[in-house]
A protein has these predicted regions:
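Charged/polar low-complexity intrinsically disordered segments
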Residues: 13-16
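Short beta-strand micro-motifs enriched in acidic
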Residues: 31, 53-56, 448-450
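Sec-dependent signal peptide recognition
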Residues: 19-24
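Residues within mature, well-folded domains
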Residues: 240, 252-256, 266-268, 295-299, ...
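Intrinsically disordered, low-complexity terminal regions enriched in Ser/Thr/Pro/Gly
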Residues: 37-272, 278-324, 489-511
Length: 511
């Protein structure tokens, strides 16, 4: 049995006076009974966000959102002959071995009349006071009616760092919101907020609702001053701003500003994006910025070929590529740095015999990334393509089409690489460590191959935004040694320690 978790880390960009780093972790938590005939899986989605409280005694807090899939729980009959489930939750916030705050509680599901067709979700929201600092957040979830030998546990580092000056809270994607006078963990500044379970917007969802807070603009800029708040959507892959999704509003300075808004995304193509809040002062300097990562599925949207037809290929560098097989090959190499829409469109384009359209598309691709020197941008990129083809080519794929090649072309060369090809009991693996990855910090990629002779290393885990994450990745590396344990301990997220097992140490402490 294989297990896959989804892990996104959303980080705010460090901008001058805005030094606060915010991380959102989205986990697909799975725990099961081993070797049970009827396996019941606890499926939960967890995210968290950071907020500030201004005033004479400023403070900070983390807000956690745990959403449970009701159909994944084990139900028991209560005294009223109805059914409910119970989940035990433990959340620790630690610095070293010192626990700075914690939550230990049980959550009861909504009451069900019967268990035949249970569906839907329910959410638990909690708040934890945490002063500025770096913490390890440890989460343990257990179905009280379906206990395992070891409940599923996961850890992640969070950084709370609200400066005294201008700063923006984390951005929450909202399922819905409404005005409310109630006081509860789901209300904030006069609104009842229901966060999104996951940052995924299918074609049936055409509105992106969000909430954020802006702090201390009056302290930094002065009372009765103004600043610009830009709200826009940009491509995750290259940061390019989408023209139809850029909004500007002049704001008055105050202690705390509540931002709650909607954006129509009916015509937003499929892909990975950031929703960005960016504040600028009178000198047009960026004084605050934060981002919300989300995914959009909109299969009805396609690139309009008429937008390319105006390009005169005789006047641009791509017109000099007259061999159709060559330009097909060149377009294929763009996949690692393309948006989803570009990948889908180009995959269909290269199936045709339309050389001119390929030339027009190729130029447009590079002009959108470097309008001044598109040819140089392509030549620099192609030099890297040749490098990865030389280093990462496998039996069946050119280097750019392999997982290592894609990561290298998308993010650049890693700062450190651990290569472990001969560790006893382990499949050959590599761990790549990036000190910085755009606005992200300290991100890692784990690759593994079943046969070193093929040079075909597959990505099995990363903690970077939008990348595959599997918190049981060590079980993949060591499963030929711990095969029986791997099959039995399906609720485990790591192999037992033994002599010669170094993967986790290499991951935590890159050489």
């Amino acid at each position: 049995m294989t297990w896959l978790s989804i892990h996104f880390t959303f980080a705010s960009q460090n901008q001058k006076k805005m030094k606060r780093i915010f991380t959102v972790l989205l986990l697909s938590i799975i725990a099961t009974f081993a070797n049970a005939k009827d396996i019941k899986i606890l499926n939960s989605y967890i995210s968290y966000a950071a907020f500030n409280v201004t005033g004479e005694k400023p403070s900070q807090y983390i807000e956690t959102y745990i959403t449970f899939d009701k159909s994944s729980l084990t139900y028991t009959k209560n005294t009223e002959n109805k059914f409910n489930a119970t989940i035990n939750v433990t959340i620790l916030f630690k610095q070293g071995e010192t626990i700075k705050n914690f939550g230990k509680y049980s959550i009861d599901s909504p009451i069900e009349n019967d268990t035949a067709n249970i569906g839907g979700f329910f959410m638990d929201i909690q708040r934890y006071s945490l002063p500025n600092g770096t913490y390890t957040m440890e989460i343990v979830l257990e179905d009280a009616n379906n206990k395992t030998d070891k409940p599923f546990k996961v850890e992640d580092q969070i950084i709370v760092d609200f400066p005294e000056g201008f700063c923006i809270s984390s951005i929450i994607g909202l399922e819905s919101y409404s005005k409310s006078d109630k006081v509860s963990n789901s209300t904030k500044n006069g609104y009842e907020l229901i966060p999104m379970i996951m940052p995924f917007y299918p074609e049936t969802t055409n509105k992106l609702s969000f909430y954020a807070e802006i702090y201390n603009s009056n302290k930094q800029l002065g009372s009765d001053e103004k600043y610009l708040l830009n709200t826009y959507i940009c491509a995750f892959e290259n940061g390019s701003k989408l023209n139809n999704y850029y909004f500007t509003k002049r704001m008055n300075t105050k202690d705390t500003e509540v931002i709650i808004n909607n954006i129509d995304i009916t015509n937003l193509p499929s892909g990975n994006y950031y929703l960005v809040l960016e504040a600028r002062n009178r000198n047009n300097d960026v004084i605050g910025l934060n981002r919300y990562f989300f995914q959009r599925s909109n299969p009805n949207y396609i690139i309009d070929p008429s937008t390319l037809s105006s390009i005169d290929t005789e006047k641009v560098f791509s017109g000099q590529i007259s061999n159709i097989d060559s330009i097909r090959r060149y377009i294929k190499t763009l996949a690692p740095i393309s948006t989803q829409v570009e990948r889908e469109y180009s995959a269909e384009l290269i199936k045709t015999e339309d050389l001119k359209m390929m030339q027009q598309y190729f130029f447009t691709f590079w002009a959108s990334r470097n309008s001044i020197e598109p040819r140089k941008a392509w030549e620099d990129y192609y030099a890297q393509v040749q490098r990865v083809n030389s280093s990462f080519k496998s039996l069946n794929n050119e280097g750019y089409a392999t997982d290592r090649g894609r990561v290298f072309l998308k993010y650049g060369a890693p700062d450190r690489i651990v290569q472990s090809y001969n560790e006893p009991g382990a499949y050959p693996y590599e761990i790549w460590h990036y000190y910085t990855l755009g606005s992200q910090r300290n991100k890692k990629f784990v690759f593994m191959t079943l046969d070193i002779a093929t040079n075909d290393f597959q990505l099995i885990h990363s903690d970077a935004v939008g990348e595959l994450s599997n918190f049981r990745w060590t079980t993949e590396i060591y499963k030929r040694t711990y095969g029986t344990y791997y099959d039995y301990g399906v609720d485990q997220y790591a192999m037992p320690d033994s002599y010669g097992d170094h993967a986790k140490d290499y991951y935590d402490n890159p050489r």
